[in-house]
Amino acid sequence: VRNRFTAKAQQFDDLYEDERLLVRLLRPGLFRRRQLAVETVAGQAEPSVLDVGCGSGRIGEFVLEAGAVRYLGIDFSEPMIELARARLERFDDRVRLISQDFLAAPVAGEFDVVLALGLFDYLPNAPEFAARMFAHCAPGGCVVGSFPAWSPVKGPIRKVRYEWLGNCPIFNYTREGLERLFTGAGFSRTEISAPGRSGFLVRAYRQ
């Protein structure tokens, strides 16, 4: 997984170009999850944000513009972090970026919003990640996550493209599985929506 995102950092970054109408039509989930992140951040007063798997900082830019006063982005791909550093430079000391695996990264304190967008697709150890997110989620805060679901149309295509050709495992989720994942990590309430046919958007709240 690390090798794929390191080698194709610019290619993944390009997927978020708003001007590319074809991307909006073929990958609407990319923009739905960004919208949910922005709405969540904008709904809080001066929130702090932890972005796990921040990639090139595309969503980070939007949540900082939406009012985040402190943003920590973590990604295990150094080329992704380099892109994020250039994109978020204008936000000065509101931003800190770390190139490291989240489970080993030196994260201190709690955050009002924890983002996990386009991350759980690739995690064989999802419960460990959810537990650490809970540990860094402030009381009253929430995790905002996106999760793929098996689709008879997109499922086989993704399996061939990522697993067979790209040597990059893909993990799918069910609504019941997501409830268990976040309840097991300690979250008190989980909101799950399925705006498209191939995945879920989640907000999991810490009491």
PLM regions and their residue ranges:
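Class I SAM-dependent methyltransferase SAM/SAH-binding core
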Residues: 56-103
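Short alpha-helix
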Residues: 169-185
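Conserved beta-strand signature within the Rossmann-like core of class I S-adenosyl-L-methionine
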Residues: 141-147
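Short catalytic micro-motifs in class I SAM-dependent methyltransferases
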Residues: 118-119
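Short, glycine-/aromatic-enriched active-site segment of Class I SAM-dependent methyltransferases
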Residues: 149-169
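Conserved class I S-adenosyl-L-methionine
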Residues: 1-42
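A short glycine-rich, Lys/Arg-flanked "PGG" loop and its adjoining helix->strand segment in the class I
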Residues: 127-139
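A conserved beta-strand element that flanks and buttresses the S-adenosyl-L-methionine
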Residues: 115
